[in-house]
UniProtKB/Swiss-Prot annotation:
Entry comment on modification after translation: Protease PEP4 directly cleaves the C-terminus of SPT7(SAGA) to form SPT7(SLIK) within the SAGA complex in the nucleus.
Compartment(s) of residence: Nucleus
Gene name tied to this protein: SPT7
Keywords, alphabetical: Activator, Bromodomain, Nucleus, Phosphoprotein, Transcription, Transcription regulation
Any GO molecular function: structural molecule activity
PTM-bearing positions, type Phosphoserine: 88, 1293
Species in which this protein is naturally found: Saccharomyces cerevisiae (strain ATCC 204508 / S288c)
Gene3D superfamilies: Bromodomain-like, Histone, subunit A
Protein name, entry field: SAGA complex subunit SPT7
Length: 1332
């Protein structure tokens, strides 16, 4: 293939072949990776010439660089011009010429008008978000917005004309086109190819087609075109290979298709000037701006390995970075700037202080990608996709020391930058430094404004001239032309002193910077105008991200809410009165005003403050500068007062600011107590402050003028480097690369300057060490970057989907629509600006610097090895041949699977698995015996089965670990990973044989490493003895014994004893354990019939009703269902007995406790009262005949017990007769008092009976009084003290001291009371208690 493409075709320029090749590449958007948007427009214009001869002629001049562009601007006609043009068409043509000339002469006027209108219309556009704006205002806003867009359109056209006019631009484009075409040929010729065909098949097809076409055409042409034919065919061929560079292109056009969306250019636009140069007349219009598109930076990065970086650009970049850091230091510390020479000689310690004092950005913001214009057919510039490298943000300033430590030791971390970024983002601050409880909306507004200012300041390619105020030395008449000067540092100072109360005030100051530059530098070719236009477009991109918020004072807002509530209450009362009178409600003017103010309170907040202090309006007008009088009419007078106060307090270290905040808070509290008094205090305070501000403002202006004069002395040469020409402006790859790597190149250059001191090498400087993780090939680093980018985009997509599921998407979309209402006609999706997260993947600049490519200066090796893709194709071919031939030979790794100790170890593992399985069955039966598990299994049987399935592991040694190792392309003997896999498998089997059911992978890996080290030591020791040069060299047996001894094995008998115990005795022991467990399991599952009882069947079982228990256990048809044919009808015998029925409560303690638990509890039986059985009921035969003998026996027992208890009593006859009475009730079981039998004497452990008894202490003894109890009983036998009887008689629970009542000693209701006890009974004393 390569031989058919002669390189000699590129030794001459064949314009016709290169033109066709360029058209084909252009149709496939191949040049988007190499050319800027302006260059693409000119190339598209050049390829759209209608005449082929003129096109080829212009192309020939273009390739030789002998061409110039004459650019003219054309504008669309207004409505009035169209109306006049309809009457007289001849005037139409002249109007275009006049308009172009007018714009050429009056460029400054248009520029100034565009910026001023931009500032005014920005307010109107933002106010469109409110729904309460009248229709008349909308018409005015639309007209003014159209005027502003028209002015911006004219400004963009002028800038485009300045860029592409002349010979320099077209010459750079010609050189770039030749470079791209020749580079494609070199890449194709020197691309490695093999027999498996890495290139696309379409290359051969396209080549054959082009060759045939060129051969047919060449028959009628001269032989001199043959080289062009072959060359063109070759060009067409390698072009298809380069299609991979542009993967994002969706449309693939035909080869012969002309460039799209272009009007044909007539030959009258081509002229030859006096210098023999071809002049191409190009007309640019609004449609031309729509063709300017954004480049794909990620694809452009893929070609950065062809950029050779030297330090020639780093000096300017370093100076710009140092100037930015010095500006930050001046803002933070209020010190004067140092001279440029001092900055270049700064020490490392001072650089660190500057870095620490430099405010960081919180969010990565998009920047232009090497192109000034980034809009696609709209007036507004389009947002770019490039993410510049920024720090973690202003939210993480408290982590700056941690971040610096991490950066220093970044090489020691084992995680990627992507993981480190998300790890740090988890600990970021939750509360911003802009948070204020008194000023509502300040945090959101100031955070967004700070991001915009810092991003503009960090855009050092164009922002350096606008960092500080204009020096009086450089522009003496500047302040005579510009009434109000503004710069980025002043904006940042005003932001930090809380002088902005709305977005519009901030936007006005930002846009005023570029307006002043364009107004003062009226020359269209002035270099600062390009910087101003670029910064203006950058500002328009970033301003969209600022929410439209007006800061409100909490006290004022609460007061307005209270007034609104009062008005609502008054309206309700009025409606009630009107409804009572039968009339319709009247529209009161005062009430309607309050209602309208409530609706648009956020918009017209400043007007409410104006009404509170109307007397200050006249006094404040003299304080407002002239530049501020042109601001929006809705700006309040109080806002101006606060701005002036804060201007005077910038240099006072924040002390007065805190005092003002305290005063404001105190006034807010007073206003909440008394509204009228607070209003007067506020008016007086504002008047006092106004008078003070007049004096302080004059003093501060004098101080600022003195500071400016001092700064001018140090800044004489500060702007000189800005006059340097940018030779890479038309080179897309270089410009984007310089923008992305600006910061890191400046840091590297600063560190390299430390190597030298006083013109000599500095031996004390620290070496600039490279990051080992970044010292990879460019392709690997770029692939890692793309993977991290894809992961980040996927993570954001998942988060966005989760937000939409939670219902927050509607709110976010509504907010975006309100803030981007004036960008509805923009082709860019409005949500992109707000979907930017601060934790996006950051671009590491160092990976794209060739200093990290250690092999960039070393020539490549001739043989680079086998490519991975090629190896895969070779293996695929080998596998296909094996499948076709049916070769299925056994792997060489499975030759010893049935030899050695492998079968014995597998047998032990199998026995252990079987024992575990039996134990699992036993534990499952035990678990089913508990009622709780039975209920769970019935409620969810599937989950119960899934959770208690035993996972049986089967060892299959016939499986090959690495079947691919059989291929001839694999070196299995020296494959470390394959050897590790086999060792890992053997160690796992050893662990299983020793009882480990499961193990953590890290533990097995550790054992594998230990085993590998041990075997390696054995081999090393044996190799050392075997290769020794000693004269006392032993035999092979002696060397083996010595090797084992040195590695911990005393003698070979230890190995034999290990094998005998591990694979002999252990196997027998495992078999014995298995047999015993199997017999125990059979005993559990097959209980004897003699052990069956009613306790074995639960209440929910139907075995007694169906006879199923007999048929399952003995095979007997107990009820004869099988003979009657009712087995299928009832379905009681077809199903097996549940396992719960057979296994629950068979001679287990759990079963007994379960039966006891089903007894009637005491609390259940206490409320039940049973009627006592009397003798009369027994005689009458009121009971079941079966129970009568038992009751008669109980009666005799009760009779004997009563007689025995009453023997010692004086009235024996009475007791005997009472038992014969029909009302005598049988005694209950608990009424029989059983005598305790004397316990046998227990012998101590010594076996001897001890005669010494332990005496009880006298303090715990109770001594009875010496009284004659028998005399007391005889004296008053019918009297006793019984609290219980007294309580029962009175029916009251409380006890009182009463007269004792006579009781029947033989009363069976209280037969065993203390009064019925005889002399043999124990003594008891029951005394009444007095009620407290």
């Amino acid at each position: 293939m390569t031989e058919r493409i002669p390189i000699k075709n590129y030794q001459r320029t064949n314009a016709k072949a290169l033109l066709k090749l360029t058209e084909k590449l252009f149709n496939k958007n191949f040049f988007d990776l190499y050319l800027t948007s302006q260059q693409l427009v000119v190339l598209e214009y050049l390829l759209s010439i209608s005449s082929e001869e003129d096109k080829l002629k212009a192309w020939d001049y273009f390739l030789k660089g002998n061409i110039a562009l004459n650019v003219e601007k054309s504008f669309p006609l207004t409505q009035e011009e169209e109306h006049h043009g309809a009457v007289s068409p001849a005037v139409d043509t002249r109007s275009d010429d006049v308009s172009s000339q007018t714009i050429k002469d009056n460029n400054n006027t248009n520029t100034n008008t565009s910026i001023s209108n931009e500032n005014h219309v920005e307010n109107e556009i933002e106010d469109k978000g409110d729904n309460a704006i009248a229709n008349e205002d909308n018409f005015v806003n639309n007209d003014e917005s159209d005027n502003v867009e028209e002015d911006l359109f004219k400004l963009d056209l002028e800038d485009l004309k300045q860029q592409i006019s002349g010979t320099r631009f077209i010459g750079n484009l010609s050189l770039k086109i030749r470079y791209v075409l020749w580079q494609c040929a070199i890449d194709y010729i020197y691309c490695d190819r093999n027999e498996f065909g890495d290139e696309n098949d379409t290359e051969y097809t396209l080549l054959d087609v082009e060759e045939k076409e060129e051969e047919e055409i060449g028959k009628n042409e001269k032989p001199q075109n043959k080289e062009g034919i072959s060359k063109f065919a070759e060009d067409e061929d390698y072009d298809d290979e380069d299609e991979n560079y542009d993967e994002d292109s969706t449309d693939v056009k035909n080869v012969d298709d002309p460039p799209k969306n272009l009007d044909s250019i007539s030959s009258s636009n081509i002229e030859i000037d006096d210098e023999r140069r071809l002049v191409l007349n190009i007309s640019i219009s609004k449609e031309t701006l729509s063709k300017l598109k954004t480049n794909n930076v990620e694809e452009i990065m893929g070609n950065w390995n062809k950029i050779y970086h030297s330090f020639e650009y780093d000096k300017e970049t370093m100076i710009k970075r140092l100037k930015l850091e010095e500006s930050d230091k001046m803002i933070e510390k209020g010190k004067k700037k140092r001279s440029r020479s001092d900055l270049e000689a700064a020490t490392d310690e001072q650089d660190r202080e500057n870095t620490n004092d430099e405010p960081d950005t919180n969010q990565k913001l998009p920047t232009p990608e090497g192109s000034t214009f980034s809009d696609t057919g709209n007036k507004r510039p389009k947002q770019s996709n490039l993410d510049l490298t920024v720090n973690l943000g202003i939210e993480n300033l408290s982590l700056k020391h941690l971040l610096s430590s991490i950066q220093q030791k970044k090489s020691q971390l084992g995680i990627s930058d992507y993981e480190l970024k998300h790890l740090i983002m988890d600990v970021r601050k939750n509360r911003s430094k802009w948070t204020s409880d008194e000023r509502i909306g300040q945090e959101e507004l100031y955070e967004a404004c700070e991001k915009v200012v810092l991003e503009l300041r960090n855009y050092t390619e164009h922002s350096t001239p606008f960092l500080n105020k204009v020096s009086k030395r450089e522009a003496p008449n500047y302040h005579q032309i510009i009434k109000k000067s503004m710069d980025l540092n002043t904006v940042l100072k005003k932001l930090k002193s809380f002088q902005y109360d709305s977005k519009q005030e901030f936007v006005d100051d930002i846009m005023l910077i570029w307006k002043n530059c364009l107004t003062y530098n009226s020359d269209p070719s002035h270099f600062l105008r390009g910087h101003a236009i670029a910064m203006q477009k950058k500002s328009l991109q970033l301003i969209r991200m600022i929410p439209n918020i007006t800061i409100r004072n909490r006290a004022d807002l609460e007061k307005e809410i209270e007034d609104m509530e009062k008005d609502k209450d008054y309206e309700l009362d009025e409606e009630e009165e009107v409804a009572g009178s039968g009339r319709k409600g009247l529209n009161m003017g005062a009430h309607m005003l309050a209602k309208e103010n409530g609706k648009v309170s956020e918009k017209d907040s400043s007007k409410t403050v104006k009404d509170e202090a109307p007397t200050n309006d006249d006094k404040l007008t003299s304080v407002i500068p002239e530049g501020e009088k042109e601001k929006d009419k809705t700006a309040s007078s109080t806002v101006t007062v606060h701005e002036n106060v804060n201007k005077n307090e910038i240099k006072e270290n924040g002390k007065n600011e805190e005092q003002d905040m305290v005063e404001e808070s105190s006034k807010t509290e007073d206003s909440s107590k008394d509204a009228d008094a607070a209003k007067k205090d506020t008016e007086d305070g504002l008047q006092d402050k106004t008078a003070e501000n007049k004096e302080a403002g004059e003093n501060n202006e004098e101080e600022e003028d003195d500071d400016d004069e001092d700064e001018d002395e140090d800044m004489v040469d500060s702007q000189s480097y800005l006059l340097e020409k940018d030779d890479d402006r038309d080179d897309l790859e270089i410009s984007v690369w310089k923008t992305v790597t600006a910061k890191v190149r400046a840091e590297i250059c600063l560190k390299r300057t430390e190597y030298f001191k006083n013109g000599k090498l500095n031996s004390d400087s620290e070496a600039f060490l490279k990051n080992p993780q970044r010292m990879k090939r460019f392709d690997q680093l770029f692939l890692e970057y793309k993977e991290q980018k894809a992961l980040e985009s996927y993570r954001q997509k998942i988060e966005q989907n989760s937000i939409m599921k939670n219902g927050f998407g509607t709110v976010l979309k509504q907010e975006d629509d309100d803030q981007l209402q004036f960008h509805n006609d923009h082709s860019l999706n409005g949500n992109e600006a707000f979907e930017k997260q601060p934790n996006d993947i950051e671009l590491d600049d160092t990976r794209f610097l060739q200093e990290y490519d250690i092999s960039n200066a070393i020539p490549d090796i001739v043989y680079e090895g086998v490519n991975t893709k090629t190896l895969d194709k070779m293996e695929d071919a080998s596998v296909d041949r094996m499948l076709q031939n049916g070769i299925n030979k056994q792997s060489r790794f499975l030759a010893n699977k049935d030899l050695g100790l492998t079968p014995k170890m597998n047998q032990n593992i199998t026995l252990i698995q079987q024992i575990r399985h039996i134990c699992h069955k036993i534990s499952l039966i035990r678990m089913l015996q508990s009622p709780l598990s039975a209920q769970n299994s019935r409620s969810n049987p599937n989950a119960f089965l899934n959770n208690h399935i035993y996972n049986y592991t089967i060892i299959d040694d016939s499986l090959d670990i690495d079947p691919v190792s059989q291929l001839p392309t694999h070196d299995y003997k020296n494959n470390r990973e394959l050897i590790w896999k086999f060792m890992h498998k053997n160690i796992s089997k050893v662990a299983m044989a020793n009882g480990f059911e499961t193990a953590h992978p890290s533990a097995i890996n550790m054992l594998t490493e230990i085993a590998g080290d041990y075997l390696s030591n054995l081999i090393k020791t044996l190799k050392l003895h075997h290769e020794t040069n000693s004269l006392n060299r032993g035999t092979n047996v002696e060397m083996l014994q010595t090797t084992l001894l040195e590695n911990g094995i005393n003698r070979p008998d230890d190995l034999f004893s290990y094998v005998e115990s591990e694979f002999g005795k252990k196997t027998k022991k495992l078999q014995d354990i298995k047999q015993k467990l199997e017999s125990f399991l059979r005993a559990l599952l097959r209980p004897t019939l003699q052990e069956l009882s009613e306790r074995n069947f639960e209440d929910e079982s139907q075995s007694f009703f169906t006879g199923d228990f007999a048929s399952e256990l003995t095979g007997e048809d107990f009820f004869g269902f099988r003979e009657l044919g009712l087995e299928k009808e009832f379905g009681v015998l077809s199903s097996s007995v549940p396992l719960q029925l057979l296994t629950t409560q068979f001679q287990t303690v759990d079963g007994e406790t379960k039966v006891q638990a089903k007894k009637i509890q005491p609390e259940e039986s206490d409320s039940i009262v049973y009627k006592k059985i009397t003798k009369g009921m027994l005689d009458a035969g009121s009971f079941w005949n079966t129970l009568l003998p038992l009751l008669q026996k109980d009666y005799e027992r009760s009779k004997a017990y009563i007689a025995k208890q009453s023997k010692s009593s004086a009235n024996d006859k009475t007791s005997m007769t009472s038992t014969e009475d029909n009302s005598f009730a049988l005694l209950e079981e608990d009424q029989f008092v059983s005598k305790k039998t004397a316990t046998k004497a227990r012998l101590p452990p010594t076996g001897k009976i001890s005669t010494t008894y332990k005496k009880k202490p006298i303090a715990s003894a109770f001594i009875l009084p010496e009284e004659d109890l028998e005399n007391d009983v005889k004296a008053d036998p019918t009297t006793t003290v019984n609290a219980k009887v007294g309580a029962e008689n009175d029916g009251d629970s409380s006890l009182f001291l009463r007269t004792p009542q006579p009781l029947d000693p033989l009363d069976m209701d209280d037969a065993f009371d203390d009064t019925n006890m005889g002399s043999n009974s124990s003594f008891s004393l029951s005394l009444p208690r007095l009620n407290q």
